[in-house]
Amino acid sequence: KRIYKFSHYDLLTMFIERCNSLVVDFGYSSMITMQNWMFLSRFENFRVTTLEKSTITDLMQIGFNTFPELNSKVALGAAFVMKKSKQNDFLASYIDLNQAPQSSDKSEIFFDNYYRKDYKISANDLQNIPGRAITYSASSNVIKAFREMSKVGDIITTREGLATGCNDLFIRTW
């Protein structure tokens, strides 16, 4: 926790942070990891601090069967290239292979346009997504809504929904 303040939740994110620290400025690193760091809320601080110093240039969500020889039908994999330089306007390439069947050979799916989906998005656009999740597939309208619209919590106080006032009278337990 002391050394890896934002990545101590997971050995994977500590590894990413350590590898990035070894890269010279404007240098590149490339890794194949599990993809949980891209979306889960507990990795938000890790994403924020990492993307403040670096830019994802390419990312491929491989999904299941990342390593067929390991029978990896449980862990979802992602391969990415990161540049140790903040470039907000850089248009990164993202490839999603997650839609292919779990048992499919990802090297074949990579060249098959039926399951493969390609996206281009800048680091600026990703900064507008709450939690800095790497949601490269978000449409321009969704990104615009996050950028320009107010959050619900900024407009009203959110709390529990409708309450009965007298649970014993109005709620039946079966």
Where on the chain are the PLM-derived regions?
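Signature of N6-adenine DNA methyltransferases within the class I
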Residues: 1-174
